[in-house]
Amino acid sequence: MFTKLATKMFGSKNAREIKRMRKVVTRINELEEQFGALSDTELQGKTAEFRRRLDEGEALDSLLPEVFATVREASRRVMGMRHYDVQLIGGMTLHEGRIAEMKTGEGKTLVATAAVYLNALPGKGVHVVTVNDYLARRDAEWMGKLYRFLGMQVGVVASGQPPEEKRAAYQADITYGTNNEFGFDYLRDNMAFSIEDKVQRGLNFAIVDEVDSILIDEARTPLIISGAAEDSSKLYQAVNALVPSLEKGEVSEEGESSGDFTIDEKSRQVELTESGHEKVEDLLLGQGLLKEGESLYSAANLSLLHHVHSALRAHHLFQKDVDYIVQGGQVVIVDEHTGRTMPGRRWSEGLHQAIEAKEGLKIQAESQTLASTTFQNYFRLYDKLAGMTGTADTEAFEFRQIYGLDVVVIPPNKPIQRIDYNDLVYLTQEEKFHAIIDEIKDVTAEGRPILVGTASIEASELLSMLLKKARIDHKILNAKQHESEALIIAQAGRPGAVTIATNMAGRGTDIVLGGNWEYEVAALDNPSEEEVARMKAEWTERHNQVLDAGGLHIIGTERHESRRIDNQLRGRAGRQGDPGSSRFFLSLEDNLMRIFAPERVKNLMQAMGMKKGEAIEHRMVTNAIEKSQRKVEGRNFDMRKTLLEYDDVANDQRTVIYEQRNEVMASNDISEMIDTIREDVVDSVVSEFIPPQSMPEQWDVQGLEAQLQSEMAIELPIQQWLKDDNKLYEDNLRQKILDAIVAEYKAKEEVAGSEAMRKFEKQVFLQVLDTLWKEHLSNMDHLRRGIHLRGYAQKNPKQEYKREAFNLFETMLDTMKRDVTRVLCHVRVQSQEEMAEIERRRKEELEREMARAKLRHEQASAAQAEGEGDDGQQGQQATPETFVRQERKVGRNEPCPCGSGKKYKQCCGKVS
């Protein structure tokens, strides 16, 4: 109540922000006449002037009015498009590092130009992130004319580009590309052999188009570069053959389970019942996969249990043409949010292989992670991040909490005239689809175009079949027609046109009422002026006809899990003040209604005694459905937040390793770091056999000599030293051993030459670090997938994960120090030629690895987000050795035992 009263008195925060920015727009408008009087050369000279003023210490913000006036005038001259006032407000929002919510058709592509140009002036680069390669190329070509006119360089990054092209694109002032490509280039750069092999420069400023799609819908799906691991295709096929023998059961209200397994559709998980467990054991025994007397739940057979669960999920929870399609002998995932296919992506936890076995396809080998990150952590690396979309306000809390981004709702240039009708709810899907066909007939009879949004490919093809039966001409747009997508959506506004689209396929292309005449002109070879004029006149007639009839009508065939995706579908109508309308048709058999809608909605409809073909239309029902959606959105947010909390642990470690790697690559001399590492390792080895503050009787001198020969390749007569000098105490002995090892190393360096040795040290450090980091990622995956079991021991899985991950990381760093020292002490470096040969071989190995590697934007299942499931790869994981500490562990914040006076973590506890 008080909040509403305060908002009424002082206006909402959003309204105050818009009011503040309108004052700046007034200043930009005052400059319009002055900048309009400049010649092209004078206008183009503004870029050099702005850069000079920045060099002299002027702030970007103080340049903003003049810069925006320059871009507006240049856009008017080059593209014939003048920025509206609200588009300038959108540009300011982006410059301030926030999200601009602008309705469909408000010209988001043009909005970005002013902010992009302003932030490109310092010369640190601006990344414009789009959802697909087509939009990246289109926008770079379209808006590139404006930027090039103003003297800016524009680049595009795409998959499959040679490194030289990519490097040039990243060196440009403005770089366009997809979220996947930017993310994978970041990972590849951190696997690079040298600084020269990297393609990206610093991550300065990114503007993310369709920011909700990239930062929210795809946030649960990590970017992974992986290499092939061991083949287990026969096991998948054998387990797949068992599934038809198992009977699906139900869980009664008393909690009793029938059948062999039960399904939880909310969490998309399966659970074996007691009888099912016994039946599976008998079947596995018959196939020779389980030995007599062994249990399916024993530690050795957990991977087998995982295979059974994956096969059951593949058969009963994942449907062909809904969750995936089979194309070219491969299972291709269909994005649940956009309806687009996602070639190259694979489900994790062995689920993808189980689906391949179900469909009788060749089973692709499981893989080992070489490098990974999430979009959440990648985009948080930018110094400044901004985004734009038509629908962000429903997710404003998540943008604020995870990315620190505020959402500003930009008012439309013209008031929205679209009418959003209440939902119509039917008892069955059959009745719902018949009602949709009737609605299509009625609306097209008025000469209005219709866009029908479906949630799956299966639904779009079923509707298409019904329309064919009714002899209604239509176009279908789903994941199977990527290439013709833009053309179909551009012509969806013609009078009487019927277009079926899965979710938001075709996003990024406007539906122009009357059709898009520019696309028709572009399809002709050298059209004459008369033809162009005729086509424009025909379009004007069609455009007016559709306007008079009431504009575009949107039909939603079911509600999505997110209100935002429903709003995106509605937003296709009523662009730029055009008339339009929308209505959703639902049934009690729809997924959202069946799984999440409250029982009272179903009971209410049945109590009303509804007859076949009748629908209920009431605001109460619509509100109840929206409440269900909010419940699902909250659940999905919790899952994304959980994933982020776990990935933050890995991200801290990733940051340390990548910073260390970059530091080593950028340096020509890491000898000081190597000396420190050697000293730590020698100290650690000596402590194993001569415990600190111990009596000589407790020393294992013979064991120490053997260990030094094994690890340091040096024979030291320590027993003889002790006989010759009875005053050789522990500290002096440690120093004498270290001096002898250093002297041996220096002698080796004199033979090879200092320059060759410096290069070799650098190569060895990077090679050891890369190998151990890959093993560490496998160990982290393994830990992550089993950590939820700690909950059964009344322990907090997240805290346990942090603790275990830190121990794994410490062990990895200790191992790295030992391995680097061991290799450097054992290898004899002879010449510069030998060094060049080692470098060449390592480069070739990295190239082979990258050629074999797969880039996966892996579809994380609900189980993964919750920390459930096991990947069935125990045999492939590099299990960390138990590290036995002979002395009290020094805390990271305690004084360093070396006596330097610094904290341990800032002294000997540091890698370098």
Swiss-Prot record:
GO cellular component, one term: plasma membrane
Enzyme class, UniProt record, top EC level: translocase
Source organism per UniProt: Marinobacter nauticus (strain ATCC 700491 / DSM 11845 / VT8) (Marinobacter aquaeolei)
Subunit structure: Monomer and homodimer. Part of the essential Sec protein translocation apparatus which comprises SecA, SecYEG and auxiliary proteins SecDF-YajC and YidC.
Reactions performed catalytically: ATP + H2O + cellular proteinSide 1 = ADP + phosphate + cellular proteinSide 2
Any one GO biological process: intracellular protein transmembrane transport
PANTHER family referenced in this protein's UniProt entry, alphabetically: CHLOROPLAST PROTEIN-TRANSPORTING ATPASE (PTHR30612:SF0), SECA INNER MEMBRANE COMPONENT OF SEC PROTEIN SECRETION SYSTEM (PTHR30612)
CDD domains: DEXDc_SecA (cd17928), SF2_C_secA (cd18803)
Ranges for region Disordered: 854-912
Protein localization: Cell inner membrane; Cytoplasm
SMART domains, per database record: SecA_DEAD, SecA_PP_bind
Membrane topology note: Peripheral membrane protein
Recorded name of the encoding gene: secA
HAMAP family: SecA
Family to which this protein belongs: Belongs to the SecA family.
Classification via SUPFAM superfamilies: Helical scaffold and wing domains of SecA, P-loop containing nucleoside triphosphate hydrolases, Pre-protein crosslinking domain of SecA
A Pfam entry, by short name: SEC-C
InterPro entries: Helicase_ATP-bd, Helicase_C-like, P-loop_NTPase, SEC_C_motif, SecA, SecA_CS, SecA_DEAD, SecA_motor_DEAD
Annotated protein name in UniProt: Protein translocase subunit SecA
MF annotations from Gene Ontology: ATP binding; metal ion binding; protein-exporting ATPase activity
Record-linked NCBIfam families: PRK12904.1, secA
Residues at which ATP binds: 87, 105-109, 510
